[in-house]
């Protein structure tokens, strides 16, 4: 990191550094941020904006940018802030990393920071008539400010950009989302193929898609806001209610972040159990993805097959956790109880069953002429697009990107098992579909190795000794795991205050699905409107994980 710090100092003399934390922290004045961002990407190869977190530090408002080098997998974070709370402004980096487009809109929605030169400064989650910015510390949350509205939200066809000229002067430029001559159709929010309350507004020429505008936030629950009034143990509950098909991974990630902050060493058996639950959850998710993708193309028979196998997983969860969904099993320090006596044998039996069933899935659908016609060379997302939009998980590996955290930055006990990272190269809907089926085989392989490790485990310690009241020191931490749909990240900032009990000063969940929905326009453009549903199904995003 010392070498990186030296190079950044040469690029930006005004930058200051803090190298004491897990990642190098770079403090940059806003007026220097855009030029430094371009240099970080083009010269130092920090080509992925992994997370963008808005924070209200009371004396200032700003953002934490977590940047990753896709070749070395090194990470740094950059802090950019403004002391102007009345009209807070920062320069956009959406032209440097395309993923910042939606992420900066999210920050504007919740903190009111307007990003100079951002092309589309609309709210993303909240209604257009919402008053105030909920994640600011001075937010007025009274009913009088935002009374319950029972009227439908009107179409938002107007947006604006704050444009800066060569002299450094800014002016507001009003824009239209769609042109007057564009033919726009509406899909959702209540549509069976959106797999949740998501709305697409698509501009079409004949049957060819020219632009897709995402309208989200229909099930936004303010999870990050709620976490600011909860204990750290209580926040775990909400992590399972974002991507419910990655419930174990999300909760695992949050526990890892808190454990890292406290220096807690988790027992080997507990971490092994966590990893097994994560892989069962991954299988659970990929099975559902297969069923939904096939159903969206009319293959009703193929839709029912994976639900048969998912029942096995539900039964395993139910025996140990006492619930089929929202298991609340991982806890800070380990897991809440030891596994059921039948757990290891049940997992072995399930692996044997699923291994025999996967060829049936291929026979039912993979070679179907309609499936090939609808998915081959359709919805292409190449490697550069994945880096630019911070796409991870199966969708990125289908484009040839080696980004599996279990391999690149092993956490938990993934360095103790052997498995292959499935990487294809076409980046189309078909390869995204195939990656998930092949990853199921690797998860079976991991689970079998874990079962053998469980047989050799000595003792039954499933949780470390953890105080009832969790108190984090002042600071900030960031943790990532490989969830079902890509990299899931948790940002925690603590002010060290523990009166009357300690609650997070700021908690942010970096959702892989939020990035995935950001490429819907890119992947659907110039494809048939009939293929929009297939393309989005192959991206496999979950709406609650986007809205949070």
Features from the language model and the residues they span:
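Terminal low-complexity/charged segments
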Residues: 1-208, 285, 367, 371-378, ...
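Active-site bordering "gate/hinge" segments
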Residues: 128, 161-195, 203-548
């Amino acid at each position: 990191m010392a070498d990186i710090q030296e190079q950044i100092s040469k690029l930006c003399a005004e930058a200051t550094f803090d190298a004491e934390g897990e990642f190098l922290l770079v403090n940059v004045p806003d007026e220097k941020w855009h030029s430094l961002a371009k240099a970080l990407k083009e010269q130092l190869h920090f080509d992925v904006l992994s997370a963008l977190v808005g924070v209200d530090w009371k004396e200032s408002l700003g953002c934490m940018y977590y940047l990753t080098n896709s070749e070395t997998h090194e990470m740094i974070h950059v802090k950019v802030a403004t002391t102007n709370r009345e009209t807070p402004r920062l320069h956009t980096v959406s032209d440097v990393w395309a993923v910042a487009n939606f992420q900066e809109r999210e920050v504007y929605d919740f903190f009111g920071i307007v990003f100079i030169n951002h092309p589309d400064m609309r709210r993303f989650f909240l209604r257009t008539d919402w008053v105030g910015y909920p994640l600011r510390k001075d937010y007025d949350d009274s009913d009088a400010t935002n009374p319950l509205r029972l009227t439908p939200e009107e179409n938002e066809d107007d947006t604006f950009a704050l444009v800066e000229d060569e002299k450094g002067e800014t002016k507001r430029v009003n824009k239209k989302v769609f042109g007057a001559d564009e033919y726009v159709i509406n899909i959702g929010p209540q549509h069976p193929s959106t797999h949740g309350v998501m709305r697409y507004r698509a501009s079409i020429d004949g049957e060819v898609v020219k632009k897709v505008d995402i309208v989200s936030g229909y099930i936004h629950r303010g999870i990050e806001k709620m976490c600011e009034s909860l204990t750290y143990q209580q926040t775990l509950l909400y992590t399972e209610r974002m991507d419910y098909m990655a419930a174990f991974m999300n909760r695992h990630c949050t526990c890892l972040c808190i454990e890292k902050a406290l220096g807690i060493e988790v027992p080997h058996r507990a971490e092994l159990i966590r990893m097994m639950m994560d892989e069962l959850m991954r299988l659970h998710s990929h099975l559902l993805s297969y069923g939904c993708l096939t159903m969206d193309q009319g293959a009703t028979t193929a839709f029912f097959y994976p639900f048969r196998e998912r029942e096995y997983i539900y039964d395993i969860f139910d025996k140990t956790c006492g619930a089929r969904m929202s298991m609340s099993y991982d806890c800070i320090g380990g897991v809440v109880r030891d596994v059921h006596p039948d757990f290891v044998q049940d997992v072995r039996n399930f692996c044997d069953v699923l291994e025999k069933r996967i060829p049936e899935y291929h026979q039912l659908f993979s070679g179907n002429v309609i499936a090939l016609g609808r998915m081959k060379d359709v919805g292409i997302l190449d490697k550069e697009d994945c880096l630019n939009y911070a796409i991870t998980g199966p969708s990125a590996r289908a484009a040839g990107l080696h980004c599996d955290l279990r391999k690149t930055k092993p956490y938990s006990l993934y360095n103790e098992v052997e498995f292959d990272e499935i990487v294809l190269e076409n980046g189309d809907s078909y390869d995204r579909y195939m990656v998930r089926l092949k990853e199921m085989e690797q998860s079976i392989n991991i689970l079998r190795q874990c079962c053998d490790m469980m047989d050799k485990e000595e003792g039954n310690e499933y949780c470390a000794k953890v105080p009832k009241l969790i108190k984090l020191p002042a600071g900030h931490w960031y943790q990532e795991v490989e969830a079902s749909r890509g990299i899931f990240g948790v940002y925690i900032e603590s002010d060290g205050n523990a009166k009357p009990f300690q609650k997070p000063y700021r908690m942010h969940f970096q959702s892989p699905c939020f990035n995935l929905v950001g490429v819907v326009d890119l992947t659907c453009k110039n494809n048939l409107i009939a293929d929009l549903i297939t393309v989005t199904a192959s991206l496999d995003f979950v709406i609650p994980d986007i809205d949070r």
